[in-house]
Amino acid sequence: RVVLPDQRGTGRSEHASAKSIARRGDARAQADYLKRLLARSIVRDLEYIRLTEFGGRAWTTLGQSYGGFLTLTYLSFYPQGIAASFTCGGIPHVPASAADVYAHTFPRMAAKTRAYYARYPEDEARMAAVADRLATGDVALPDGSPFTPRRLQTLGGGLGMKPAPERLHNLLDTAFETGDGSPACAGSTPELTDGFLMAVLQNLTTAGNPLYWTLQEFIYANGTLDAPIRWAAEHEYARHPEFDAAARPLMLTGEAAFSFMFEDDPLLAPLKPAVDLLMEDTEFDEIYDERQLAANEVPLQAAVYFDDLYVDSGLQLD
């Protein structure tokens, strides 16, 4: 029998949204609730299901990406609940650190961007033309939210998977009402097509996954932190001037949460006060027991993806 659980806050497991989280109370109450949607609580749920619904029979687990993180949490605290485990692209670095993750993934994202432009040379100028148009500050997506160069950069989030490069290329091909957006083709103020703006919104919307960016950096928080997370990706971004939205070629960002997302996205904006509090917190549930993992006797097979954009292969192999 295959069991595919909806993790806390997703699917039919009391789906979380800005509206439902707001009902929890003030920003502090919301932040504390969001902490209950992380790995330690998810694994407790799975262990409860194992004991109450499956007669205590040990699982054989398969964890992809974040599922691998959950696997190590499970093996840390309830190893008796697992007969064997398999992970794919999902061995977190232990001890975990959001800062370390982004220090590794931003150089990978720069390389992915350059590879994309090498494959589609015309897209370097086209992406720059879109960014230049957005820099005027008067472009909105169909939901009314501002479309900025920083939001444009986040379209690179899919470049770690196939066929994302092809999709991004096709998207840019429809960007402008006239030509490629250059002054020679479209004049001094090129217009973006409605179809392009809608496709961008469909790519960026968090309507179906509000927790994805909300909890992005907190999945690395393990117990008592030495220092608050304080927008780790934002700090790493600032360390790389080539990623500045005014720099050319325009570099794209990957799986990284930024504070502007919680200002520009109307579905995330209500969560910003709670997320800001979490960014200053240093007390989280412990999610990995290094001693237990070092003594692990449960069979574990791990597949590590070469040049993984999301879970750095170097950190996985360390």
Residue ranges and their predicted role:
Residues A39, F258-S259, A302:
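Generic secretory/membrane-interface signal
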Residues D138-D281:
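Alpha/beta-hydrolase fold active-site neighborhood
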Residues D318:
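Catalytic histidine neighborhood in serine/cysteine hydrolases
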